[in-house]
Regions:
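Soluble or luminal CAZymes and related metallo-dependent hydrolases
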Residues: 3, 63, 196-199
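Short, conserved secondary-structure transition motifs
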Residues: 22-25, 44-52, 123-129
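Structural alpha-beta junctions
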Residues: 35-40, 111-115
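Catalytic core of tubulin tyrosine ligase-like
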Residues: 77-92, 97-209
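A structural signal for isolated positions on well-ordered beta-strands in alpha/beta enzyme cores
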Residues: 17-19, 39, 89, 117
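N-terminal glycine-rich phosphate-binding loop and ensuing alpha1 helix
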Residues: 1-32, 36, 55-56, 60, ...
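Short catalytic/ligand-binding loop motif for oxyanion handling, primarily in non-cytosolic enzymes
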Residues: 28-29, 48-49, 98
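Divalent-metal (Mg2+/Mn2+/Ca2+)-assisted nucleotide/phosphate chemistry catalytic cores
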Residues: 41-93
Length: 209
């Protein structure tokens, strides 16, 4: 990355069709800052739940599992399709070392005839807050770190970690938009309050075929 340039700056230099998923708390700010540079689309929210999983009067973003659905519903997929886009890199904003302009995953997907590929790295220690790569019955999927048992966190159990960097074909995105995903529950502090509750989220890795 060039000095003074963020990864988003780098992305927008090379891919003017970039899209950024926002939340209600930052949508206006990001939309104004990126006007004419990227398409901003806002994710939906879900309520926090109490210990008995009853809704509380507080909400939070529904998670990155909604991203592909929003791309289709908000017309962004149509725009990209008309522009001749075939593959889309999808990565989380907290992955600050990822290069959104990396075309190697798309090249791999095209060469191998795959509609969804992901980048993984070797795990470093059992306490890392990263999802782990699990192979079962010929399929690969990701298990979130908050849902791992002590045994599953052992480095000898699962060797590789997800860095939330995916590449999807446009046809896969269109199909994924119609899928129903399971909810994941994480006990968290509710921002702006002294309370804690179950935060409900959809995870994008549940879309993996």
């Amino acid at each position: 990355v060039l000095p003074g340039l963020t990864l988003l700056d780098l992305l927008l230099r090379h891919h003017p069709l970039a899209a950024v998923m926002t939340s209600p708390s930052n949508h206006t700010l990001l939309s104004q800052a990126l006007a004419g540079k990227a398409t901003c689309f806002m994710q939906s929210e879900l309520p926090f739940l109490d210990a008995a999983k009853n809704p509380l009067p507080f909400s939070a973003p529904a998670g990155n599992g909604c991203a592909l659905k929003h791309l289709v519903e908000k017309g962004i997929w149509d725009t990209w399709k008309q522009a001749g886009i075939e593959y889309v890199n999808v990565l989380n904003v907290d992955n600050i070392l990822a290069d959104p302009t990396d075309t190697s995953l798309a090249a791999l997907a095209q060469a191998e005839g795959n509609e969804a590929v992901m980048r993984v790295i070797p795990r470093q220690n059992p306490q890392e807050n990263v999802g782990v790569i699990v192979g079962e019955e010929g399929h690969w999927h990701i298990k979130e770190y908050t849902e791992l048992t002590a045994q599953e966190k052992d480095l000898t159990q699962y060797l590789y970690a997800s860095i939330s960097f995916f590449c999807f074909s446009m046809s896969f995105i269109q199909k994924a938009a119609a899928l129903s995903l399971p909810l994941h529950y994480v006990w968290k502090k509710i921002p702006g309050t002294s309370l804690s509750g179950w935060k409900c989220e959809y995870y994008i890795f549940d879309l993996l075929p």
